Amino acid sequence: IANLPSTVEINANHWTSGDPYSHDIVGHIRGGIKPEQLDGFLDSTGIKYDKNRINGKLLLEWQNASKVDVRAIIAIAMWESSLGTAGVATSPGANMFGFGAFDSNPDNAKNFNDAKAVVELAKQTLLANKNRTFKRQDDKAFANAHGGLDTATEGGVYFTSTSGTGKKRANTMALIDAYIDANGGADDHLTDIGDTPSDAKATESLTSNIPMVKATVPT
């Protein structure tokens, strides 16, 4: 993202493992983050996003419902769809997180709006398929590309790219964290909120037979 710095100082207290790349993004959040801080970060990206579709208030609601760290939610939305401004995410009814946008059928993302998608992303992609850190997502994509991923025991991949997709998302989380520190701060420790997505309203009327992860044959 052109408008953001390439590196920032990492505060180990803000991550389960001491760093964003290995941070467990489900169930562990930095408390005290304010909607206005998230709005400020979104504005700082220079992306011309829809402020009614994604904003600090909604992001914190999605964190509460999905149990996914809000810093990770933003990072995913930025790299999947430039905050809803690119790809299938611009279609009516589709989501900005790439959920349901299978390589073979990207239009399937239209079955999940943003609120539904972030909860199902947590349930299916991150939890059921054991993709709780961005490092693990990268490691599994690499193993998948080289025929070494046992999906029966390790779960499916989140993405198939081996270009460091997870590391890019982790770096974005670090930028978000640093922006918060520079603009009022938040808790200097993590809070465990459990890892059971809880928003029944967000998950109603979901199609039960949607495949859990993207699946493509490596080239």
Located regions from the model:
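Conserved beta-strand/loop element in small beta-rich adapter and peptidoglycan-binding domains
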Residues: 208-219
